[in-house]
From Swiss-Prot:
Glycans are attached at N111, N213, N278, N409, N531. Its EC number is 1.1.3.4. This is Glucose oxidase. It comes from Penicillium chrysogenum. Changing S118A: Significantly improves thermostability. Glucose oxidase catalyzes the oxidation of beta-D-glucose to D-glucono-delta-lactone and hydrogen peroxide in the presence of molecular oxygen. The enzyme also catalyzes the reaction with D-xylose but at a much lower rate. Shows any activities against D-fructose, D-galactose and D-arabinose. The enzyme is cytotoxic for a series of bacteria, yeasts and filamentous fungi and acts primarily via the liberation of H(2)O(2), which is a harmful oxidative stress-generating agent. Keywords: Cell wall, Cytoplasm, Disulfide bond, Extracellular matrix, FAD, Flavoprotein, Glycoprotein, Oxidoreductase, Secreted, Signal. The gene is GOD. Gene3D superfamilies: FAD/NAD(P)-binding domain, Glucose Oxidase, domain 2, Glucose Oxidase, domain 3.
Amino acid sequence: MKSTIITSILFSVATVQAYSPAEQIDVQSHLLSDPTKVEGKTYDYVIAGGGLTGLTVASKLSENPKIKVLVIEKGFYESNDGPIIEDPNAYGEIFGTSVDQNYLTVPLINNRTGEIKSGLGLGGSTLINGDSWTRPDKVQIDSWEKVFGMEGWNWDNVFQYMQKAERSRPPTAAQIEAGHFYDPACHGTDGTVHAGPRDNGKPWSPLMRALMNTVSAFGVPVQKDFHCGHPRGVSMIPNNLHENQIRADAAREWLLPNYQRDNLQILTGQKVGKVLFNQTASGPKAVGVNFGTNKAVNFNVYAKQEVLLAAGSAISPLILEYSGIGIKSVLDKAGVKQLLELPVGLNMQDQTTTTVRSRANNAPGQGQAAYFANFTEVLGDHAAQGINLLDTKLDQWAEETVARGGFHNVTALKIQYENYRNWLLDEDVAFAELFFDTEGKINFDIWNLIPFTRGSVHILSSDPYLWQYANDPKFFMNELDLLGQAAATKLGRELSSAGEMKKYYAGETIPGDNLPQDATVEQWEDYVMMNFRPNWHAVSTCSMMSRELGGVVDATAKVYGTQGLRVIDGSIPPTQVSSHVMTVFYGMALRIAESVLEDYAKSA
């Protein structure tokens, strides 16, 4: 059976260049690699992690010359792999190098261990990701306030910060002709982070228009712009890069213009192990961090105002647990004395990815597009089955998830599930993304955007420098997640040779002969379980929501029950989003930086 869609058919842009050797040396000369240079010192703010959010917030705080900021980053600045980092067309070549942390999961479904790709170095995952630049659905961000009680976290507010972060570059006439549409009202033009069309100078592939014409013939909208609050349909997308096609990573955008500030120091090659606290009448107050490379070689540095955790969704919860903040049973097992009970490390929401690839005839040239497909487009003939699951299984799923250790409160988790049900059935929110790439092939990378599975990440020992933890996304422990991934992958195969695409289709290579052309969705489920990979978009391990619903941080990113401690990275969004996540994280970082500065002004 075929899917319904088939059967119903602060540098100016001109001057930005690749890093020069002289520039490399100058930046390196301003960075610190000797931990004794900061040992025992006091800064206003100590930031654990020099990735997207860490460097963004550090840049904003240090605009005030009176504020002293220290960033501690486990990795380094650039590397021997620098040219690969700078070229967004070399995506994937950087994996396995010195800037890829490559966390491993516990054994997953079918006893497969997953690799979690994550950037290591100043810039974090912006050094290695696909630099795709899209925004989520309005109702998703609105739910952060409406459902989870986070005042001020609504689309209209967050959209302003996403625009403030952006320095957008409109497409040229040739790019528009190829299918690169643009709505200037949905973009910022005066921000720090450069974004615009990816263009390697080759002709544009006719496959872009062929895909648009194929899906639009069956009622799928061709989107003018995926940044306006309802990314459903198909369009080409901008990327996080400069006009000369150099990657606009967070180090280039936020560090390079500011590394010479006297009040901003960056320490590399050191890992933050835990937060230091003083006990007060109002509860534990963060006063610094312990950092280093191993149990015998570590140091303390102090924060007069706040400690800000920006180590990412896999690591920030571990730092909290090593510091004594978390679930008592987890901390007891690891040998850590509990300081505060919070559901740290739970509610992990990552996505899964599969690929469909075919050869292409007479379709040379470049181009990337995305098809954000809604629930019925993805499930097709199985839509009624999916609706029935959402109407009858939420209670059961919540109970099973809590029993497996993905969350701690059945009632609160059901509220999350009801929110997702509303998105999918009532709000036309995209359920899956089919990311389309050409260059002599028809290639879809496909992921279910809205997972109901909840995983976890927890420490396994009391030594933060041993790197012992359990990263357990629990992929496909929910039947709708598996059905959705299978149906979306099946849809990718069908689209590859449907409509106008058919004249360019020259035979499938993935899955190819590994799966019959008339495979059922059940056969696709078996295939998916053996051939998926993590999508590396995990969020919510330190969820920003009301404490009653299972939150770890409040609407200002402050850790509940503490003073002087915030989590400011991708571990705090309470939901997944139907987009690539950089735009959300940048907007989030700017909003949090503003909140930190407001508190600083009050204290001063």
